[in-house]
Structures are given as C-alpha cells and as structure tokens.
C-alpha cells in the first residue's frame, strides 16, 4: 500500500516534534484496524495538539489522492490519541476486536477504537 511519512516540525523554530504518516487506499485491514493516519509526538512535545493539527494539514493531500474518508484507529485506553481524533474532527464509530491473524493482535493488542473523518 502506498504511504507517505512526514516530520512534524514547529512552525516558528523548525524543531522536530514527531512524525505522521498517511496510507493511501482502502484495504480492509487498514480501514477496519490499522487506519489511514498514524502519528507519534515526542514525549516532550505532547499536550499541544500537534498531532491533531498535523492530521488536519494532511486532509487536502489525502483528497488530492481521491480519498473522501479517512479512518484513524487507536487503542481504547489511549486517551490522548482518542482526544486527538476528536480535536481533529473525527467521529467515533465503534470499538472492534482484532482478529487473531492481525499483526497487532500478535503484538498483544486486542481492540481498536475506530474514528471516521469525512473530508
């Protein structure tokens, strides 16, 4: 699946804050379990909504690839990521159980929250 990865950088200082990636396409395992967007903000920069803003900045880019809906998933106990999805404009849809053959299940994860973003 085609994907892009970008650095999150502070607009004023240029300091690296984390990274974000966008997966292009609608494979079932991405839509249901993995999500189109993934992000990580370095611990010392958390709490400033950098991930939410970075997600929003990628929406036009996703649209330029013909995407009209994006999915983001996170662990149910990851309150910060759930809040990021809400701040970025996502709609909580459901919590799903991961199938046993899913890579994330093999890593010990069992469920994912699914958020939908209509572009």
Can you say where each PLM-predicted feature lies in the sequence?
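Acetyl-CoA-dependent GNAT
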Residues: 1-32
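Conserved acetyl-CoA-binding loop-helix of GNAT-fold acetyltransferases
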Residues: 39-41, 47-64, 83-87
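Conserved GNAT acetyl-CoA-binding A-motif
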Residues: 62-73
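Conserved catalytic-core motifs of GNAT/GCN5-like acyltransferases
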Residues: 73, 91-107
